[in-house]
Amino acid sequence: MSDNITRHKSQRWVSASKANYDGADWDAYSSNSEDEGLTNNIPQLPQVNIPESNNIAKSSSPDPSIGTCLRSDSLNTSVRSGNKSVNDDLDSLMHQISQEMTAKDEDVNNTSDPEDEDDAELKVSKTGYFAAYVNDEDTDDRESVKSDIESAKLAESATEINKTDNAKAESVSEVESVAESVKRAKVEVEPVQIVNVGEESFKGDDSEAESVKRADVEVEPFKIVSAEEEPLKGDDTEVELFKNAASEVETSQISVELQDEMIDPTTEIPSRIQGDVAISDDKGSKDAVDEDNWSKSDSHPESIGSQDKEEMPPSSINSLPSESQLSIQHSKEGDSNDSDSLLNGYGSEPSLMKDNASPVKLRKTSKTDLSYHDGYSSESSGEEKERAISEVSLGQYVVHSAESFKFRNPVRNSVLDSSDDDIDYTDEDGDLEVTKSGYFAAMVDEDKEIDDSDRHTLNNNDTDGLTADSDVNSITESVTKRLSQSSITQSDVPDQNSENDVGGYSDSSEDEEDGPQKLAFSTRESINLGKWKPDTDAFRSGFVTETIDINNPPEGYTVNEDGEIVEVNKNTTSNIQRNSSVASDGESQFNAFPHDVASDDDDLKTIADTKTIYDNQTIYNVPALIANNASAPALPTNIQITNESTDYVSSNDTIFKHVNGEAPKGESKLKEAFSSEGDEIPSVVHQSTVPNLDLVKLLSSNELHSQKLKKLNNYKEQLKEYDSGLQSWIQYALKSSTTSDKDFIFKDYKVNKHVQDAYAQADILSKKNSVANTVNQNVTHLKKKMFSSSMREKSKGLFSSIGKKL
């Protein structure tokens, strides 16, 4: 059973799990501590003798503007320490997998030739997964390198000739010859594979690594400090090796500065050549060069350019100058290109650790990069960032440290990335770079063309840091300029009316003599884009009836001298004046659902309101006229209300009166008798006034006391004789009526005719069946059944049982 299961495994994992697998088909690497001893396996660089010339050094001085193109960000060179503790289970698991998949490192002979090293460079299985990728990219790299270097050197030659004065002809010829030799050497040595020094860590001697890395910038005032003057502690062979490398880097600097303006920043440079010269930085305590030497090298670019050609060994052209030259060139391109690398916000830069040294490595592409690595480090140098990002963007392999393979890192660069949207990183220079075959190729090409044209314009005008105005700003400036010109032209004519200045914005009778006011009107006219406005007239006509045309008054009305429509009446004293909103009978209808008369489709016809009579009571009940009373007919203003008392009471009477009910002619089942009866309440004759006596006045008078007492007694008698009717009201309220209470209440409290008519016609209305009536009858019937059948018997049994117990 177990054998059947193992057959389904992939061939790669099965081979890795077997003991006899020796890694012959895999030239992988690992960043374990076992690779620390590979520092001594670096081959000896060849040397070519080139005659030194002091005259050339004295006469040649590069343009200071070119020297300042060097990246200032390279001063902040400090690499994060790669020795991190593994705190995550996932990290340790993936590290073990990386160790299992890593083959044993092959020994490389120090005395081996570059051709031998090139043969051992890419040993990948011809039937493996990565065979197709390696073969295709190997051919593409060789072709692209040849074309790129040739175009770069030709541009370099043209630029050198244009920028050098006639007085410096000798220095121009020397620099041009150096550039041509570099180009020929690079084309010849192309098959040779250079060990990726930028990804290795030299554990043997820290001071040697530091001297090589900073040899191109260690300068005293107008003097180059060679590598021999540094306190080197290693072997003599290694000192000689690194001294040659430093001289080669210095030599390539002149060509890099001269071709900065001519080479297209979008040119693809394979990472195998572009990023080979870089030495990982060690701790700050082991630095052999001070920060002062770094600043000196930036402040004296002339000395660097002049003495490079003096100390440049002849043997350094065949191998290393092209790589370092392209690497520095690419780092300078990042300063002026806004869209060089899309992967600055997409992928993450591999941290250059100490333990990732291996002379022979498996070529990796963007599809075969299976290792994790740390995200961008704020301490890493800008030049290393540019190199690493370019390697990823151009589809080349990048050496990543297994120590940086962390799941806990917020920024990752691997095929196992969960999402690319969570990486919110922007390069310190704002550079973006994408592949030429990617989705964003067309957009990036357009951006680069615009950026190149802008940069060329700025260089011609000798203006630094000046950006072109946006389209909106330019349009605004042009509009403002036109407005100011037009306003100044208009202000020169003081006799012009405001109508001539701004058509339709002001009356023609007003003269605009103020200049600023003209400008304001002109501005409004110029920038008015004609905003959309709703057709309020048509919108209103669809819902509300239009008012009467004064020119065509309705029949029976005429227009008076004030422009108001009034009725035509011979009797001028009784004229009823109405305002202009008076409508005829047909126009006074409220059309709640307007219908188009032109279309005689019966299906589109809607409900139309009947003729509406507007008076004091109905005007507030008509819809849509409450909020828009202007279209309603006007009410009369001079009508005299006549209060004529009549004995007749109409059906719409709203005054409460005591009237008799008119019972229908037929038999009535009601018990009430609606015959007129006399009022049973005794009428109390009330005196008109209540007896009154001013006691204060009486007591304060000068009359005799006998007269005062007599008046008081008379007042007392008058009060006794005064009857307020309270006793009669109390007796009527407390008396017992011979009739039933219902009849008594009905007779005493009936107030109007419609109440009595309702009671009289109740028997007829009760015969009409309705849902509510049926429900009420059923409920009443159920109640009768329940109480008659059950409750009555139970109540009898209850009382009988209680009586028995008693």
UniProtKB/Swiss-Prot annotation:
Residues 38-63, 71-85, 315-329, 458-500 have a biased composition (Polar residues). It comes from the Eukaryota. Residues 1-88, 101-124, 248-389, 409-517 are annotated as: Disordered. Residues 280-312 have a biased composition (Basic and acidic residues). Residues 418-432 have a biased composition (Acidic residues). InterPro entries: Fyv8. Belongs to the FYV8 family. Involved in the resistance to unfolded protein response (UPR)-inducing agents. This is Protein FYV8. It comes from Kluyveromyces lactis (strain ATCC 8585 / CBS 2359 / DSM 70799 / NBRC 1267 / NRRL Y-1140 / WM37) (Yeast). The gene is FYV8.
